[in-house]
Amino acid sequence: MSNKSVLLIAGEPSGDLLGAHLAQSLKSLEPNLKLAGMGGKRMREAGVEVFINADKLAVVGLLEILRQFRDIRHAMQTLKRYFKKTPPDLVVFIDYPGFNLHMAKQAKKAGIKVLYYVSPQIWAWRYGRIKKIKKYVDHMAVLFDFEEKLYQKENVPVSFVGHPLANAPTPSLSRNEICKQFNLDPDKPIVALFPGSREQEINKLLPMMVQAGKLIQTQIPTVQFILPLALNLALDKIRPFLSPEIKVIQNDISHVLAIAHAAVAASGTVTLEIALQQVPLVIIYKVAPLTFWLGKKLIRLSFIGLCNLVSPEPVAVELLQQDATPQAIADEVFQLLNNHNYRQSIIGKLGHLRPQLDRGNAAQNVAKVIHNLIFS
């Protein structure tokens, strides 16, 4: 019987989902393994003893972090105490690099093994963080093959586990069945809206999406809109921004993407999820002007959308800051729906993404790495 324990640390909804899948895989490998950590509803449902709720910690940008500083500091102090009083056999840090790299240092100081799941984007900006990773991380579990090569070059122990989204199950229901379930007409165009999972994203992006929707309706009166609500968001949070024609459902992205003809999405992991289902999309994002200015100074990339970053060529138009207007969004969605050649060209490019990222079940692959680290 195992008395080993693993701490899972996730600070965002995407990390919470990865943590939940990882917890399930770990339990199937080692049923008596104790799992605790920081996360959200998904991890809790997967049997993790979540003692820090991460819902308030999912922020992006300097000003936004300052506003949530008290919650972030409290989470850090709680984890430091946990490391000292109840040290686990291993800590798994999932994404969320600003917080997690700092806490990896604290875990290492306490003599705890560290695995980092989902690499910080050091290939995009602040490559110098590789020094911290070398010093404080025992093993990296990365989602992209080019990241594996990067860490191998730097002599950091690493495993390319594949991207979880590339191996996600597809809905068993037919398109007509899903449309019936959502009370949508399968013969009319459907546009999916993904305004993000953070309050700051909702406040900035959802009003634009709603206005863009009204403009699209003037060109395509039969268009239908569907918005899968992120698990960490209450309907009351978005209700003030909604218009009657937008159908809101609770976090059912796979079924939504199975019926959508196009999507409008906040930059983030969801852009890759949409792209892997070969749904043409437009990416939008807005942050505080100072945050954007700092980002432009520091980031070495031409694109911010994850689907564009991992593709040999751009697969989605990005509308950022002042370029993200209702009219610009509506114009691009109209092209994605009505310009047949353009639409087919985009779908063709999207079809090349999955083979690059699929290495089987990513959560099971990470669980095996963890098992080797704590039982070898």
From Swiss-Prot:
<dbReference type="GO" id="GO:0016020">
    <property type="term" value="C:membrane"/>
</dbReference>
<dbReference type="GO" id="GO:0005543">
    <property type="term" value="F:phospholipid binding"/>
</dbReference>
<comment type="similarity">
    <text>Belongs to the LpxB family.</text>
</comment>
<keyword id="KW-0441">Lipid A biosynthesis</keyword>
<dbReference type="InterPro" id="IPR003835">
    <property type="entry name" value="Glyco_trans_19"/>
</dbReference>
<keyword id="KW-0328">Glycosyltransferase</keyword>
<protein>
    <recommendedName>
        <fullName>Lipid-A-disaccharide synthase</fullName>
        <ecNumber>2.4.1.182</ecNumber>
    </recommendedName>
</protein>
<comment type="pathway">
    <text>Bacterial outer membrane biogenesis; LPS lipid A biosynthesis.</text>
</comment>
<dbReference type="GO" id="GO:0008915">
    <property type="term" value="F:lipid-A-disaccharide synthase activity"/>
</dbReference>
<dbReference type="Pfam" id="PF02684">
    <property type="entry name" value="LpxB"/>
</dbReference>
<keyword id="KW-0444">Lipid biosynthesis</keyword>
<comment type="function">
    <text>Condensation of UDP-2,3-diacylglucosamine and 2,3-diacylglucosamine-1-phosphate to form lipid A disaccharide, a precursor of lipid A, a phosphorylated glycolipid that anchors the lipopolysaccharide to the outer membrane of the cell.</text>
</comment>
<keyword id="KW-0443">Lipid metabolism</keyword>
<keyword id="KW-0808">Transferase</keyword>
<dbReference type="GO" id="GO:0009245">
    <property type="term" value="P:lipid A biosynthetic process"/>
</dbReference>
